[in-house]
Amino acid sequence: MIDVNSFNALKIGLASPEQIRSWSKGEVKKPETINYRTLKPEKEGLFCEKIFGPQKDWECHCGKYKRVRYKGIVCDRCGVEVTQSKVRRERMGHIELAAPVSHIWYFKGIPSRLGLLLNMSPRALEKVLYFASYVVIDPGETSLAKKQLLTETEYREYYDKFESQFKKGKGFKAMMGAEAIKELLKELDLEALTKELRNDLKTAKGQKKVRTVRRLEVAESFRKSGNKPEWMILDVIPVIPPDLRPMVQLDGGRFATSDLNDLYRRVINRNNRLKRLLNLGAPDIIVRNEKRMLQEAVDALIDNGRRGRAVTGPGNRPLKSLSDMLKGKQGRFRQNLLGKRVDYSGRSVIVVGPELKIYQCGLPKEMALELFKPFVMKRLVEKELSHNIKSAKRMVEKVRPEVWDVLEEVIKEHPVLLNRAPTLHRLGIQAFEPVLIEGRAIQIHPLVCPAYNADFDGDQMAVHLPLSAEAQAEARILMLASQNILNPKDGSPVATPTQDMVLGSYYLTLENTSDFKNDAYFSSPAEAVMAFRQKDIDMQEPIAVDVRNYEKKDFSLPENNKPSDSNLLITTVGKIIFNEIFPEDFPYVNGEKPGLNEYDWLKSGERIEDKLKQREPREAIQKGSLGDLVGHCYRKYGSTKTASILDKMKEVGYSYATKAGVTIGITDVAVPEKKHEIISDAEGKVDEVEKQHHRGLITPQERYTRVIDIWNNAKDSVTGAVMDNLDIFNPIYMMATSGARGNISQITQLAGMRGLMADPTGRIIDLPIKTNFREGLTVLEYFNSTHGARKGLADTALKTADSGYLTRRLVDVSQDVIVREEDCGETDGVEVGAITNGNEIIEGIGDRVVGRFAAADIRDRQGNMIVNRNELITEDAAEQIQEAKLDQVPIRSVLTCKTKNGVCVKCYGRDLATGAVANVGEAVGIIAAQSIGEPGTQLTMRTFHTGGVAGDDITQGLPRIEELFEARKPKGLAVISEIDGRITVKTEHNKRKVIVTPEKGEQKSYNIPYGARLKVKDGDEINAGDEITEGSINPHDLLKIKGVRGVQLYILQEVQKVYRMQGVDISDKHIEIIIRQMLKKVRIEEAGDTELLPGSYVDFFDFEKVNERIKEEGGEPAKAKSLLLGITKASLATDSFLSAASFQETTRVLTEAAIKGKVDPLIGLKENVIIGKLVPAGTGMPHYRNIDLAYNDEENEAQSDKSQDEQEIGEITVDMGE
């Protein structure tokens, strides 16, 4: 076997007949497989042991030699080499064909490679190959042209005329079949052909130019790769090893076999028949028919169904050919090379483990014993509880009592990986320290559920065991759940309390000012808590506490705003208890945010009651504020301390959710009195509108819009009434306002009215549902509400599949983007401003620049320096930028990074998952793809109509994201201006025209399509690339007008718009990485003195390199245009044929790669996974792999191993804390 680490690249090419024979261990001459009586392989058949090796280890066919001691001997009776049976997975055979046949990939692919080389149409080729016409090889003295087709009668005519020449082998010659094509290919002179084609290119135009470029490309491929064109015609066919196309006996004595064996049998049968016919000297027509059948049999073997009807097996099922073995989800690439099943794994149902620490998981005992079996056996022998491994294995299998103690020892500090499918982002696999538990379900910590998107309604999870010391170290340092607190997509905490924990914290920190009894003052927090335990005060009652005796909090922090003349803090017992979660140098949390204001302090002589009247009640802790607190802790203390704070939050949350005793009953759903009044009021208004419509005062469209408005307003009023009607301790109200479960609109549906519903097309029905679920719906109302419900379910199902496919394409396009160096030296950057929608700021400038490096010095309006060039913009700096109200800030961006095959640290900035600057080796491409793909399921699917409003529906949600990333011409296209200038709007013959007049140069006029809405008025100033009508811009047009930078920023803003509308935050840098990959290629317009072919796609960096070289030599450089490729196209245009072939269109990619003799440099992650090397990212990068460790002696070895681990963990915690 070859060692995967001993090579750096992989080359693919065409195999010559000699090469195929050299692979082979013998010729397969008979179609037989297995003898039905002896069940042994037939000699010279498809499973022959002489050719492919023995079926049983160390045993020849006739049984003369058995046992290892005869290793390597070839049996003199049966000719089988005595060796291991696994050679039957690697030894190949071959079939010598009686007549050459063409390879269907090169003849039938689009464009037909054979057709391009010979300059023949695929139709003509087909006629020749399948024996319908003759082709002239040598016209001799006839008036025919070379490569001209002749019918049978024409051929006879010429043959009779020029018989004498024909006999001598000179002059006129015409043939049919693959032999004829092979003759023509042999005669090709590639050097001359490429010269001639390059000359033709200079004059060619239109279609002819396109074809010439294509022909030149194929000819050049053959010339450069050293492949010979005649190798596209096969004389010999390789037979793949028999264990890759097995034949197994089923229970009933019947045999099941791989389809390939049937296909090979057909080829061998036809080939043998052809040989016999040729030996007998059969008539031409019979031989010809046999040759055609052989050609068809070989076609079916290589790619069944590519030409004509597919060969079917029993039950009319098309047989799976060699090509089908590679293609699709079940093919070799995606099924076995990219996704293998692994040993040391198990799966089980998950249940909640509320008493676990965040980095622990409960592992069922029997499962752990099976997973850790080898470790337990080794330990048993070490402890001399058993004498050898065999008896240790017996002990484990019999489950002796002492085994459990050893298991406890073994699993200590040995992390396991837990994975939940679907793994949408990297947080779908995390490492935990196992804790042995009884039962058969895996326990997981409630705080890691959001990351896995797990719940406990029967979800299952898989457990994997990292085996080597390195794998364990990586699992512990990088993947432990306590290290994965932040979400890589936007840097917000993902491990935040949910549901019960939120409800508990909310109940605990509520402030109830409604039934304020008396002023209560306490000398210390401990005294207040004691009074609460004695039931002297309520948990939610405002009290004043002297903070001088508060040991656990530091009130001198600036955030606490403590006045010098006051020591009394107005708070509640609940908040005192809640604040015990945080360290003493954390600001006191009295409302949503950490920190206090002047209304929280009581000066001497003031009363609590008076102070409460001056301010609104302080907010209770909701889900959002809990998340903010976690983020605050992470920035302040780093991951390890935050993890323990999270565990305390969980304890407090659950404990007080239990004490709150929140239940839900029908009486909690209180329908407000005002509801009926509001509804009858609305009905009156609707009647009024209907009357106006009947009198013809308003159009049906106006009536519809007004009715919808009336009911929407009515629903809003009802919502208000419902909320006013609920007590702050109402369980439903608490659940919704705390963010634990449900929302206001659901409360309105329970207690108010359900409101307007959409019909199946998405149009809103103007008859609302006036009742709520408490009162019950009428039959018609129930029917109306089924549309929306059904659409919701159908949408969800479709969305999941579409979103998964989008993620797959994104990963494929960006998988080779890795942080490769510290600084690429690029001086240019991108100007970034706030994202706005109309006048509303969607994302402020501070949020957009935080964690990036400045591309130039950033100063405020007074000229004071905020950030120097190439410095990281921290949270504080971002705040200063926000306060300075700067419009644009220059930052380093992935879009301008000069690193080849990746990005540099300075252009990427901060790694959002750790909050520190990214490391070299970080696989940022895949993180980007996951960050965009994972929220895809939350985006809406189809376009919603707001009830027949005129104008095209602008696509939104998932389809819009797909439209942008695939760089398609959008639906609802906007007309855009190609020049800067002033607008004039004209109407001629009922058609609207917009004329743009520039200051200099000629004006441009644009016809406005019917029904389009203008975005500009007469006399407006407009810039090139701006929209004239509403709609979406075609990115390809924008590329022509505004260039690369314009289209980059447009796609970025548009993608962000879709996600922001759904309330999903994604960092710009992720989208930038995908856009960078879409704009990586250029199309060569003029070749100059370079070797590049006009019309070919070339990587931008390679193009610049070639041009630099030509300039140095004094030649004329090539000219090229920027290309915008959709993500599917960009994935297929990658340099790696392995990555492209495993993505889509496998046969096309491999055909092209083989002709070009492509070399896969193994740069991306996918290609390395396919061939089984470590991925070149993270610790798999070359400069991490080439480190040698030297040890002094055994003892030090153990010591240094341990201390190094500790150091690394120590360092990591220090880093995080910075």
From Swiss-Prot:
Residues noted as binding Zn(2+) 2 in the record, renumbered to the chain? 824, 897, 904, 907
Q: Which residues bind Zn(2+) 1?
A: 60, 62, 75, 78
Gene Ontology BP terms: DNA-templated transcription
- Binding residues annotated for Mg(2+), in chain numbering: 455, 457, 459
Q: What is this protein called?
A: DNA-directed RNA polymerase subunit beta'
Task: Please list the reactions this protein catalyses.
Answer: RNA(n) + a ribonucleoside 5'-triphosphate = RNA(n+1) + diphosphate
Self-association and partners: The RNAP catalytic core consists of 2 alpha, 1 beta, 1 beta' and 1 omega subunit. When a sigma factor is associated with the core the holoenzyme is formed, which can initiate transcription.
Please provide one cellular component term from the Gene Ontology annotations of this protein: DNA-directed RNA polymerase complex
What organism is listed for this UniProt entry?
Natranaerobius thermophilus (strain ATCC BAA-1301 / DSM 18059 / JW/NM-WN-LF)
Cofactors: Mg(2+); Zn(2+)
Q: What class of enzyme is it?
A: transferase
Q: How is the cofactor bound?
A: Binds 1 Mg(2+) ion per subunit.
E.C. code? 2.7.7.6
List the GO molecular function terms.
DNA binding; DNA-directed RNA polymerase activity; magnesium ion binding; zinc ion binding
Q: Which CDD domains does the entry mention?
A: RNAP_beta'_C, RNAP_beta'_N
Keywords attached to this Swiss-Prot or TrEMBL record, sorted alphabetically, are:
DNA-directed RNA polymerase, Magnesium, Metal-binding, Nucleotidyltransferase, Transcription, Transferase, Zinc
